[in-house]
């Protein structure tokens, strides 16, 4: 559970910004989207491999550029 305590003389905007940062770092939304539907382990592994290949290709292209 992500929570934020208000500091002295802190505006709501700054508090909201701190909350959003903590929320993103905690990975709440990412985990929610991942658990929204079931993926077979074989499909999940296949997707992870393909994402890794794409990431490696991009890194390789950046090194060569």
From Swiss-Prot:
GO MF annotations, alphabetized: structural constituent of ribosome
Gene3D superfamilies recorded: Ribosomal protein S8
Residue numbers spanned by region Disordered: 43-65
Classification via Pfam families: Ribosomal_S21
Gene Ontology biological process: translation
Keyword entries, A-Z: Ribonucleoprotein, Ribosomal protein
Bias (Basic residues): 48-57
A Gene Ontology cellular-component term: ribosome
Membrane-spanning residues: none
HAMAP family linked to this entry: Ribosomal_bS21
Family named by the database record: Belongs to the bacterial ribosomal protein bS21 family.
Name of the protein in its database record: Small ribosomal subunit protein bS21
